[in-house]
Amino acid sequence: MVSSMRSLFSDHGKYVESFRRFLNHSTEHQCMQEFMDKKLPGIIARIGDTKSEIKILSIGGGAGEIDLQILSKVQAQYPGVCINNEVVEPSAEQIAKYKGPVAKTSNLENVKFAWHKETSSEYQSRILEKKELQKWDFIHMIQMLYYVKDIPATLKFFHSLLGTNAKMLIIVVSGSSGWDKLWKKYGSRFPQNDLCQYVTSDDLTQMLDNLGLKYECYDLFSTMDISDCFIDGNENGDLLWDFLTETCNFNATAPPDLKAELGKDLQEPEFSAKKEGKVLFNNTLSFIVIEA
C-alpha cells in the first residue's frame, strides 16, 4: 500500500501548486515581512560601512518577493550606494517570476541583478573551480536548506564567503513548530526521496555550534490554516495534505490508517491550535543570523 504513495517532488507542477496553496493559507510571508521590518535594519546596520558597493547573495531566491523586501531595507540603510544582487535559483520558472516585478519596480536604479540557474551545490562547485572566492556583505538562504544534501559543508562554504562586517541570514522552520513533531513522528511513513530532508532550527543550531560559528536565533510565530484538510473532497485541503506530507495525491493514495491517525494528530495542541472554528497548524519560523 505504501508503495503507491509518491513523493511530491516527483511532480513539479503539483509541488508548485501545493506550495502556492500553502502560501495562500499561511502567514509565512507576513511573518517574514515582520522580521524584515523589525529586526533586519539592525542586523544590516554595518554591512556596508565604508563600502562603495554592497554585495548581496541570495541562495534559493525563488520568485524574489522576500529578496525585494531585503533590498528595500538595504537601500534605506545605505541610500544611493550601488548594490550587486546575485541570485542562485534552480527553477527557470521562479527566475522568470522574479524578473517580472524587478522590471516594474521603479526605485531599483542602484541595484544590479544577476541570476544563476543552478542549485547551491552547483554554484559552490563552479566558484571553487574558478578559484575566485568573491566576498559578500550579506548572504541569505530562505527556506532552502531542506534541499541541500550536505548542510554542514554548505554552511561552512558560504560562511567562508562573508566579508568584513558581513552577515548570513537563514530562515527555516523552528524546532518548536508543528513541522518538527510531524517529521519526527511520521517522516518514516511518508515517501522517501533524496531531494529533501527534514531539518529544523534545532538541527541547524547544533551544526553551527559544531562548526564554531557565532549566531543569534529569533523565532516568530506563524500559522497555516489547514481547516480545509478536514472537508472531504476539498481541493484546497487535498493540496495542503500533499504539502504537509510531501506526498503526491496523499488523500487518494495513503493507507486509511495513516490518514486517520495523522488527521487526528494534526488537530492536537502540539501540532495546531483551534481558533474561531479553524485549525491552525504551527508554522513557527526561525531566523538565524550568522556573524562573519
Swiss-Prot record:
Alphabetically ordered keywords of this record: Cytoplasm, Methyltransferase, S-adenosyl-L-methionine, Transferase
Transmembrane segments: none
Subcellular location: Cytoplasm
Swiss-Prot/TrEMBL GO biological process terms: histamine catabolic process; methylation
Coiled-coil ranges per UniProt: none
Binding site residues for substrate: 28, 283
E.C. numbers: 2.1.1.8
Gene Ontology CC: cytoplasm
Top EC class, one word: transferase
Annotated PROSITE patterns: SAM_HNMT
The keyword Cytoplasm is annotated on this UniProt entry: yes
Gene Ontology terms, MF aspect: histamine N-methyltransferase activity
UniProt superkingdom: Eukaryota
Residues that hold S-adenosyl-L-methionine according to the record: 60, 89, 94, 120, 142
UniProt catalytic activity: histamine + S-adenosyl-L-methionine = N(tau)-methylhistamine + S-adenosyl-L-homocysteine + H(+)
Similarity comment: Belongs to the class I-like SAM-binding methyltransferase superfamily. HNMT family.
Function: Inactivates histamine by N-methylation. Plays an important role in degrading histamine and in regulating the airway response to histamine.
Assembly behavior: Monomer.
Protein name: Histamine N-methyltransferase
Gene: HNMT
